[in-house]
């Protein structure tokens, strides 16, 4: 049994049993992977994968247990490397983060700047995606940390730590009627709304607030990016609902932000990492 064989069966599962995609991601050949899997199955005396002709179609019952153990072994191997790096050069290495646009654009820049000043020999790598995508990256150990408000709780193998609470603001053009009256859910629901796609930046709590009052918001446009939302508010498509931290009066001229924290429950941004991961000192 070879470590490489364990990596192959683990990666095949991450690529939905697609051997070609697995080979491409590992910069190796499809026949080479198939041969190593057959050798491992022959050594173990069982099939890890069920097949239809040459295609892998499912994981066998025993294969599921084997792959779970393989994932732990691969994680332990990575931890061994981290321990060695920490012992030889504790301030040198790499750090990979997966997060959403809102966090990358509005929250992390000052944090990243301070980190890079404190650890100039650590290279940083940032991946952006949906909350589900970045949670999967952390669960699969493809990044060190995932930072998001949604989806992390769906993965049992992730440790989650709350980082900060935030709420929302209503974004309107200068002179909008909502600026002249108390802000209510009824008033917001009466307007065309531009906001986040479901599953992004606390959108689920937004929908729950309206549903709790028996209201159906008139959402006319959705996006994953607060900058895009503000652009379409400027175009007159509707009023925007975004994270308050994504509004900057100096940069967002021509727009006004109305605090809506009394209407919606706080959202909590969390940092998640794979359970059992050895964390470097930095």
What are these regions (language model features)?
Residues 155-193:
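Flexible hinge/capping segments at coil-to-helix
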Residues 92-154, 216, 222-223:
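Central regulatory/effector-binding core of bacterial HTH transcription factors
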Residues 130-143, 149, 201-258:
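Hydrophobic hinge/microswitch elements
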Residues 41-61:
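A short LG(V/I)-centered, amphipathic sequence patch enriched
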Residues 178, 192-213, 279-282:
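Secondary-structure junction motif
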Residues 107, 256-282:
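A late-sequence structural motif
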Residues 43-44, 66-88:
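Alpha-helical linker/hinge and terminal dimerization helices associated
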């Amino acid at each position: 049994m070879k470590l490489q064989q364990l990596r192959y069966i683990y990666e095949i599962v991450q690529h939905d049993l697609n051997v070609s995609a697995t080979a491409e991601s590992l910069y190796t050949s499809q026949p080479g992977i198939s041969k190593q899997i057959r050798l491992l199955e022959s050594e173990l005396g069982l099939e890890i994968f069920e097949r239809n002709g040459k295609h892998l179609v499912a994981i066998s019952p025993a294969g599921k247990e084997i792959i779970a153990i393989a994932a732990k072994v691969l994680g332990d191997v990575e931890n061994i490397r981290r321990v060695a790096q920490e012992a030889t050069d504790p301030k040198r290495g790499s750090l990979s983060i997966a997060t959403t646009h809102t966090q990358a654009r509005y929250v992390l820049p000052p944090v990243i700047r301070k980190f890079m000043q404190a650890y100039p020999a650590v290279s940083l790598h940032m991946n952006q995606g949906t909350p589900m995508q970045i949670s999967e990256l952390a669960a699969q150990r493809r990044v060190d940390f995932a930072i998001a408000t949604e989806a992390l709780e769906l993965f049992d193998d992730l440790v989650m730590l709350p980082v900060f609470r935030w709420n929302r603001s209503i974004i309107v053009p200068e002179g909008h009627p909502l600026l002249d009256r108390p802000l209510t859910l009824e008033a917001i629901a009466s307007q065309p709304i531009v906001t986040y796609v479901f599953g992004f930046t606390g959108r689920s709590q937004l929908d729950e607030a309206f549903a709790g009052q028996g209201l159906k918001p008139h959402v006319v446009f959705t996006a994953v990016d607060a900058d895009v939302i503000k652009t379409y508010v400027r175009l007159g498509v509707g009023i925007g609902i975004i994270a308050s931290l994504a509004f900057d009066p100096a940069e967002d001229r021509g727009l006004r932000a109305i605090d809506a924290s009394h209407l919606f429950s706080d959202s909590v941004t969390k940092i998640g990492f794979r359970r059992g991961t050895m964390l470097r000192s930095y």
